[in-house]
Swiss-Prot record:
<dbReference type="InterPro" id="IPR037518">
    <property type="entry name" value="MPN"/>
</dbReference>
<feature type="short sequence motif" description="JAMM motif">
    <location>
        <begin position="184"/>
        <end position="197"/>
    </location>
</feature>
<comment type="similarity">
    <text>Belongs to the UPF0758 family.</text>
</comment>
<keyword id="KW-0645">Protease</keyword>
<dbReference type="GO" id="GO:0006508">
    <property type="term" value="P:proteolysis"/>
</dbReference>
<feature type="binding site">
    <location>
        <position position="186"/>
    </location>
    <ligand>
        <name>Zn(2+)</name>
    </ligand>
</feature>
<feature type="domain" description="MPN">
    <location>
        <begin position="113"/>
        <end position="235"/>
    </location>
</feature>
<dbReference type="GO" id="GO:0008237">
    <property type="term" value="F:metallopeptidase activity"/>
</dbReference>
<dbReference type="Pfam" id="PF20582">
    <property type="entry name" value="UPF0758_N"/>
</dbReference>
<protein>
    <recommendedName>
        <fullName>UPF0758 protein AM1_4368</fullName>
    </recommendedName>
</protein>
<keyword id="KW-0479">Metal-binding</keyword>
<dbReference type="Pfam" id="PF04002">
    <property type="entry name" value="RadC"/>
</dbReference>
<keyword id="KW-0378">Hydrolase</keyword>
<keyword id="KW-0862">Zinc</keyword>
<dbReference type="GO" id="GO:0046872">
    <property type="term" value="F:metal ion binding"/>
</dbReference>
<feature type="binding site">
    <location>
        <position position="184"/>
    </location>
    <ligand>
        <name>Zn(2+)</name>
    </ligand>
</feature>
<feature type="binding site">
    <location>
        <position position="197"/>
    </location>
    <ligand>
        <name>Zn(2+)</name>
    </ligand>
</feature>
């Protein structure tokens, strides 16, 4: 695609809005999604809206990170330093980013059945996703795996959390839950478990066996993604739970 070509000069099948309607948003490039928000082009060389979207992404790729990661936390003053992005375009982008965060953080209502790691991660996203510090939280469930509530047990630093099995089980017992899923976030966005994560999970599984309070999973959340330790490790085989 020629980025200086006007959107209206493109065949309809190549126009971002028409492609979104015909094929769905997931088939659009990052630049095309930005183009829909921007509406019109500008910037160096009088770029099209798609070209301006690509220019924005290239600007943020100079941070040696995924430009979407940088864009997630950008502010209006940073956006308006980019040629072609004025206050109107900047606020549209920021509003879309914030709406996306809120949708990601929306959690199911209480008494929803938590029968899948993705449902559990969605229920905890509001507490854990996009946080700059590590947080450790617990999903409190009844015997039918229905959600009774969520509880943040501890807040740590940018690189570690300070959760202790004693504090976690105290919350589970205090709230009258009979099943639990624990989770924490990695501010780095990486969801691979650390040796400390695995060690804590082993301790929790052993404690859950003794107390008769099955631990259903331990999730690690980051950058809109998650890892289920029950699905990716053998810890539950080594320390079976009455699920």
């Amino acid at each position: 695609m020629t980025y200086s070509l006007r959107i209206l000069d493109l065949p309809e099948s190549d126009r971002p809005r028409e492609r979104l309607i015909a094929q769905g948003a997931k088939y659009l490039t990052h630049a095309e999604l930005l183009a829909i928000l921007l509406g019109t082009g500008q910037g160096p060389g009088k770029l099209s809206a798609v070209g301006l979207g690509q220019h924005v992404l290239q600007h943020f790729s100079e941070h040696q990170q995924d430009p979407l990661t940088v864009l997630r936390d950008v502010n209006a003053s940073e956006l308006t330093t980019i040629q072609g992005i004025g206050p109107a375009k900047a606020t549209t982008i920021l509003a879309a980013i914030e709406l996306g965060k809120r949708i990601c953080q929306a959690r199911p209502p209480e008494l929803t059945v938590i029968d899948d790691p993705a449902v559990a991660a969605a229920a905890l996203a509001g507490e854990l996703m996009w946080q700059s510090q590590e947080r450790f939280a617990v999903l409190l469930l009844d015997v039918k795996h229905r959600l009774l509530g969520t509880q943040v047990v501890s807040i740590g630093t940018a690189t570690e959390t300070l959760a202790h099995p004693r504090d976690i089980f105290r919350e589970i017992i205090r709230k009258g839950a009979t099943r639990a899923i624990v989770a924490h976030n990695h501010p780095s966005g990486q969801t691979d478990p650390s040796p400390e994560d695995l060690e804590l999970t082993q301790q929790l599984l052993s404690g859950a066996q003794i107390l008769g309070l099955p631990l259903l999973d331990h999730l690690i959340l980051g950058n809109g993604d998650f890892t289920s330790l029950r699905q990716t490790t053998s810890l539950w085989n080594d320390c079976p739970q009455d699920l």
